[in-house]
């Protein structure tokens, strides 16, 4: 699509040092004999160059925001390669390391490195008085509640209940359903790289961003999209703490967003980066009422908060990636029990009570386990053997968190039950082996 080269000028631009991150979508008008005509929106700038020089995305291309992708590069002779005006990602109550979990979401997006800023929450009366019009600041909300993550840009046009903004993609995800809320710019910080905005974010959902395309974000007013409600309970030495937040109900996003919120809140509860043990219990509710309950454990020698947070998004990633149907996750209730002790043991020795066992009988195996900095313990497990076994049988013994490693042994693929329907996938999630369990497999 074509872009229009412009030079921004005037007292405001002089004060800000040029086009700032967060100004993307700012409407540009041309004076005509019939009055001002909307040319388009500020969309692209040249990094480490004159910040007053920018490229405008034409309004006709923004109105056709469902068209195909543009070239991967936008280059202007004499100026070099242009990049989209950086979109500030505003974080409220999110640490730098929790924000790092978000990086995969922005890795393929056609945006410049994002200035990450702490934001505040605007008062309710400001939301009530907010007017959505060209030039207004809005925030596309990814997480809201006790954790907030949103991206700030500018409205280009509001036409017949439809909104156009940004003048370039945000994540480049195509068809989306993301809520947008008011944003209130508090300051513009000059910078030699790219000036950027500081802003507070409102809570009132103004509508839904439905298209995240190369030329614009396009959305509808007064239409609130579905979100995933997350309730998080943390139980540790300081007692129980409860939190709540909502994340975008996009399968490409919610596993990472849930994990990001969990890491921030676990970090806040622990107050330190240290090793330990965590037990996670999920209740995932799908639209229609079906529930998936899971229990899992994780141990880490140096960073239990990060390990638990990454695990928190695991079942959601499985649901999001399934090939059978949309998961339609509605709610996630997550209870996390934290312990600063290392609750892990290594399997030091396994001894068969008898090396000869009749088919259909059970093999008894004595295991010596070495817990972390505690006395070794001996446990005996009983392994029932099928009646049709004959010849030499190998017993594979591992912890539930250890993947199957068979070496030169050949496993019958028919014995490895892979889900074939969405219902079977849910059953597999419910019954999957926990990290605290021992797995003994007989292989012929």
Language model segments and positions:
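Terminal presequence/propeptide segments associated with secretion/organelle targeting
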Residues: 1-444
